[in-house]
């Protein structure tokens, strides 16, 4: 695990974006990551998006680490998993 990127267990469901949003601490600075609920269902099957996220947390956090290291944030500074 990359100690420079940490993921606190503070994921939430965002009704506006229909996504699970979760913070990442990058060298102590908070960044926001997200994955759409539809993407979670497509990848992992039926279920509530928050439950699917929690079940597959380690893989999704690893993917988020890759997106953060690649600097692939959107115009709002968020890192979205596709």
Language-model-derived ranges and their functions:
Residues 2-4, 46-82:
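Acidic, low-complexity intrinsically disordered segments
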């Amino acid at each position: 695990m990359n100690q420079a990127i940490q993921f606190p267990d503070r994921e939430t469901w965002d009704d506006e974006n229909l996504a699970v949003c979760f913070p990442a601490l990058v060298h102590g600075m908070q960044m926001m990551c997200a994955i759409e609920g539809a993407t979670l269902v497509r990848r992992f099957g039926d279920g509530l998006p928050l439950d699917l996220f929690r079940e597959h947390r380690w893989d999704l956090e690893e993917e988020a680490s890759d997106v953060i290291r690649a600097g692939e944030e959107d115009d709002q500074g968020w890192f979205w998993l596709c």
